[in-house]
Swiss-Prot record:
Molecular function GO labels: cytokine activity; growth factor activity; interleukin-3 receptor binding
UniProt-annotated stretches for the region Disordered: 145-166
Positions glycosylated per UniProt: N60, N70
Similarity comment: family membership: Belongs to the IL-3 family.
Subunit text: Monomer.
Source species of the chain: Rattus norvegicus (Rat)
Intrachain disulfide bonds: C43-C106, C105-C166
Pfam families: IL3 (PF02059)
Its job: Cytokine secreted predominantly by activated T-lymphocytes as well as mast cells and osteoblastic cells that controls the production and differentiation of hematopoietic progenitor cells into lineage-restricted cells. Also stimulates mature basophils, eosinophils, and monocytes to become functionally activated. In addition, plays an important role in neural cell proliferation and survival. Participates as well in bone homeostasis and inhibits osteoclast differentiation by preventing NF-kappa-B nuclear translocation and activation.
Keywords: Cytokine, Disulfide bond, Glycoprotein, Growth factor, Secreted, Signal
Stated name of the protein: Interleukin-3
Tissue: Activated T-cells, mast cells, natural killer cells.
């Protein structure tokens, strides 16, 4: 009888300790999951990848050059390039759409972006000339850490390709 009583009391003490220890492990695991949800985008490399896909051509309009060099208009111009890319090259034959979208993580939006005029692209040729000039002047881009959604497990039915979230 004494043996059963002491075994029960030991088990009653070990159970709460085991539960506390298990919760501590779960908390530290969650912290490491958060680390895995971050990755670094090398913004300069993304800009160079866009640059090599565009033909070498000169941009002559000095107003366009000034607009495209203006650091306060970077995000507005990027948004305009994304719209123009969709309009002029909806099949993404230049294969730059995803890279332009990644650049959105590298170039922060300004509070006054909605009222600023962006670059105007007349056609695909004009778009490529201006985009090339724009990307050449993104020399000071720094790597940024971005979050990404958790990767689906092999049992997931709704697999989606990884998207970058800024």
């Amino acid at each position: 009888m004494v043996l059963a009583s002491s075994t029960t009391s030991i088990l009653c003490m070990l159970l709460p300790l085991l539960m506390l220890f298990h919760q501590g492990l779960q908390i530290s695991d969650r912290g490491s999951d958060a680390h895995h949800l971050l990755r670094t985008l090398d913004c300069r490399t993304i800009a160079l990848e866009i640059l090599v896909k565009l033909p070498v051509s000169g941009l002559n309009n000095s107003d366009d050059k000034a607009n495209l060099r203006n650091s306060t208009l970077r995000r507005v111009n990027l948004d305009e390039f994304l719209k123009s890319q969709e309009e002029f090259d909806s099949q993404d034959t230049t294969d730059i759409k995803s890279k332009l979208q990644k650049l959105k993580c590298c170039i922060p939006a300004a509070a006054s972006d909605s009222v600023l005029p962006g670059v105007y692209n007349k056609d695909l040729d004009d778009f490529k000339k201006k985009l090339r000039f724009y990307v050449i002047h993104l020399k000071d881009l720094q790597p940024v850490s971005v979050s990404r959604p958790p990767q689906p497990t092999s049992s997931s039915d709704n697999f989606r390709p990884m998207t970058v979230e800024c």
